[in-house]
From Swiss-Prot:
HAMAP family for the chain: HrcA
Protein keywords: Repressor, Stress response, Transcription, Transcription regulation
Domain of life of the organism encoding this protein: Bacteria
NCBIfam families on file: hrcA (TIGR00331)
Protein purpose: Negative regulator of class I heat shock genes (grpE-dnaK-dnaJ and groELS operons). Prevents heat-shock induction of these operons.
Source species of the chain: Staphylococcus carnosus (strain TM300)
Gene3D superfamilies listed in its UniProt record: 3.30.450.40, Heat-inducible transcription repressor hrca homolog, domain 3, Winged helix-like DNA-binding domain superfamily/Winged helix DNA-binding domain
Gene Ontology MF terms: DNA binding
SUPFAM superfamilies: GAF domain-like, Winged helix' DNA-binding domain
Protein name: Heat-inducible transcription repressor HrcA
Length: 322
């Protein structure tokens, strides 16, 4: 446990190092943070923090920089002193959904880029698990090219479109019957209105099963959709000394290992993984994890990826609004 003054000095060193990328000396701490003690006292406290492994002495400078342990301590205190969220309704995301006619993929793609622009870091958004999103309506439409378009409406407002080639045009009445039957398969409230034998001996049996298979396949696919914003920011925020980390983190993201990071994360709010807490070879990387909600019942995941010298406070405050 460190004293309040030592915590203030550690905070000053972390925040200055993040902002300027240079080791921080005692004089800088006093001038920039109005610490009302002598430089000698600051230097003594720095030696204590260094002895605890929270800061490190630069070889060619009298200043200190945060260690990985120091970043971890700083972040833990930051999270501990941040009030938990009580509101989960994301107004910006809801507006994007409305703007893009409730196409969740388009809305999340734009949202990932917006978050990246706000944080100045790379942002990743994972689509919600829509297997928990109730299907409220299904519509089928003919097209001129012997295609049937299936429009699926979810309780969250998301809309998905699928298409199936058919040998002949299907009448509107039959399309309505098929759509209602498919809806009953995926909506427990309607299951008593139809029996499994409704289309068992019908000419439409094959089409019905193909549409159901398409929908099941789509529901399985959309649970792992990932959207990136600002991938180039990784290169901008990692300096020449971290070139190896750029390659490592890109390989990590492309391998979808981050999905396991979300799965292993037991925090209900915001969590921060630093360096090897993420994976071997990522000592210079930090990932801030959070959830986002649609209509308070559908939950997805968001991650902000950057260097260990990240503006944690700014990103955490922004993610608390997600």
């Amino acid at each position: 446990m460190i004293t309040n003054r030592q915590q203030s000095i550690l905070n000053a060193i972390v925040e200055d190092y993040v902002d300027y990328g240079l080791p921080v000396g005692s004089k800088t701490v006093i001038e920039r943070h109005q610490v009302n003690v002598s430089p000698a006292t600051i230097r003594n406290e720095m030696k204590i923090l260094e002895g605890m492994g929270l800061i490190e002495k630069a070889h060619a400078s009298s200043g200190r920089s945060p260690s990985i342990k120091g970043f971890r301590y700083y972040v833990d205190q930051l999270l501990e002193n941040t009030s938990p969220r009580t509101e989960f309704n994301n107004q910006r995301l809801n507006k994007l959904l409305a703007d893009y006619n409730y196409n969740l993929s388009n809305a999340l793609s734009v949202y990932a880029n917006e978050l990246s622009m706000s944080t100045k870091y790379t942002t990743l958004i994972m689509k919600p698990n829509q297997s928990k999103d109730l299907i409220t309506d299904v519509h089928l439409f003919n097209t001129v090219a012997h295609l049937v378009i299936m429009v699926i409406v979810f309780e969250s407002g998301n809309v998905e479109h699928l298409q199936l080639a058919v040998p002949e045009k299907i009448s509107k009445n039959r399309l309505v019957q098929i759509a209602n039957y498919i809806k009953s398969i995926f909506n427990a409230d309607m299951r008593n209105d139809f029996s499994d034998e409704t289309f068992m001996h019908s000419n439409d049996y094959l089409i019905v099963n193909q549409l159901i298979d398409l929908l099941n396949q789509r529901l399985n696919d959309i649970t792992t959709d990932i959207f990136f914003g600002g991938k180039a920011n990784l290169i901008d925020t990692l300096n020449e000394q971290n070139v190896n980390s750029i390659q490592q983190i890109l390989q990590y993201l492309e391998s979808n290992k981050i999905l396991k990071l979300f799965e292993d994360d037991n925090h209900s709010g915001i969590d921060v993984k630093i360096g090897q807490e993420i994976d071997n070879g990522l000592e210079d990387i930090s990932i801030i994890l959070s959830d986002y909600h649609i209509d308070n019942h559908l939950k997805g995941h968001v991650a902000v990826i950057g260097p260990t010298a990240m503006r944690y406070q700014n990103v955490i405050q922004l993610l608390y609004k997600v």
